[in-house]
Amino acid sequence: MHVKTGDEVLVIAGKDKGRRGKIKRALPAVNRVVVEGINIVKRHQKPRGPGRPGGIIEMEAPLHASNVMLICPSCGRASRTGKRFLEETDHKGRPRKVRYCKACDAVIDK
């Protein structure tokens, strides 16, 4: 996936198009992400015991990962990302793979 938990993203499609948020959870098995404050749905919940009453609760539903675009931390624009290998190696001796911004060519992953 082109985004990770904690990334700042811009929603580019759907009812929340144009809004920004931070990724709370990434679900790579189904290619979806949960974004803070975006795609709010109302859930009708039955009571689940003495400490958890029922009612209508609002929660964030997952969005498809293709409907969000990463906001580059260095240039501040929503841009496409790519992956490249660095000269330095990881703990197993392989070249380190990082994401980079295609607009400003800056490395996103530290």
Curated annotation (Swiss-Prot):
Q: Which domain of life is it from?
A: Bacteria
A GO BP entry is: translation
Q: Which InterPro entries would you find in this protein's record?
A: KOW, Rib_uL2_dom2, Ribosomal_uL24, Ribosomal_uL24_CS, Ribosomal_uL24_KOW, Translation_prot_SH3-like_sf
Give the range the annotation lists for the signal sequence: none
Q: Name one GO cellular component term.
A: ribonucleoprotein complex
| Keywords attached to this entry | Ribonucleoprotein, Ribosomal protein, RNA-binding, rRNA-binding
GO MF annotation, one:
rRNA binding
Q: Which CDD domains match?
A: KOW_RPL26
UniProt lists the family membership as follows: Belongs to the universal ribosomal protein uL24 family.
- Quaternary structure? Part of the 50S ribosomal subunit.
What role is this protein assigned? One of two assembly initiator proteins, it binds directly to the 5'-end of the 23S rRNA, where it nucleates assembly of the 50S subunit. One of the proteins that surrounds the polypeptide exit tunnel on the outside of the subunit.
Report what the protein is called: Large ribosomal subunit protein uL24
